[in-house]
């Protein structure tokens, strides 16, 4: 049986640094657990532009379509701000998402007990928090036509963006949310603005249809997105899986991210339609950006990238036990007080570099055997 295939795109800024720690962990799984991967590497973002004049080469795109999963570090940096919009580093990531048709963006928001005091909310509100936000990624107001800025008849201008969703676009992301809920606590909350938007009415009706016809065993609730934002701050532990559209998902997932204490801790997955092996096309990446201000200094927190690989183990490689092993290793390291610079607080801890955090996670993995 062939080894699972993984394409690594380290990208820009701190991307190569945090990805280096993931590659060490991949090596650990091969050596200590007999779990081997066919790993290939390529360029994306600014690094690809510097080498090829494009943020994503056609050959890289073709390889991404062939592998079981893609793991990306980060893209972008101030040196590329002068580039035309069509070749900015971020366009490489957007092309991956679009051409792989990655329509379901998974953003977990988990608050590790050791970091509960880093949250902007009180410990008793966020302790034990474990939410999964499923954001529709390829449709909605970011992609709808018509769009643009146009002159009006009074010497001014007006801007237009179009929120557009089809039945199938809503149903497929709803199915992703219900499938995830079955693996978790079996609850889905769908968020929209059905009180003021026709697209919200359609969203609510289609999510309800998927529930009634395909997932009646999963508990479903509906909530207006503005109330959802308030509830995330008021009582976030009421949620298990949240499913919402592109715009609201963009906002709500960032809101949920700050409940956890540090963007350096948060992984993400973008999933598409099932491949021949029954598993979805997938791109995994940390939520944080390229952080050019600390690149090359050994200060970056690699945990978000490490946990992104854990998501790949679970959702692309069907290795849930190994994913849990890696997640528990991270939890152990944090409980032991090991901290990169972004996690250092008044209570102190053991300060470590990027590679030092990788060392600690590898030691915890060894201890798990």
Curated annotation (Swiss-Prot):
Residues involved in NAD(+) binding: 77-90, 289-301
GO cellular component: cytosol
Enzyme class, broadest EC rank: oxidoreductase
Subunit (UniProt): Homodimer.
Record keywords: Amino-acid biosynthesis, Branched-chain amino acid biosynthesis, Cytoplasm, Leucine biosynthesis, Magnesium, Manganese, Metal-binding, NAD, Oxidoreductase
Lineage, opening ranks: Bacteria, Pseudomonadati, Pseudomonadota, Alphaproteobacteria, Rhodobacterales
Site entry (Important for catalysis), positions: 142, 193
Cofactors named for this entry: Mg(2+); Mn(2+)
Amino acids binding substrate: 97, 107, 135, 226
Organism: Cereibacter sphaeroides (strain ATCC 17023 / DSM 158 / JCM 6121 / CCUG 31486 / LMG 2827 / NBRC 12203 / NCIMB 8253 / ATH 2.4.1.)
UniProt gene name: leuB
Superkingdom per UniProt: Bacteria
Binding of Mg(2+), residues: 226, 250, 254
UniProt xrefs under Pfam families: Iso_dh
Gene3D superfamilies per the UniProt record, alphabetical: Isopropylmalate Dehydrogenase
Protein name per its UniProtKB record: 3-isopropylmalate dehydrogenase
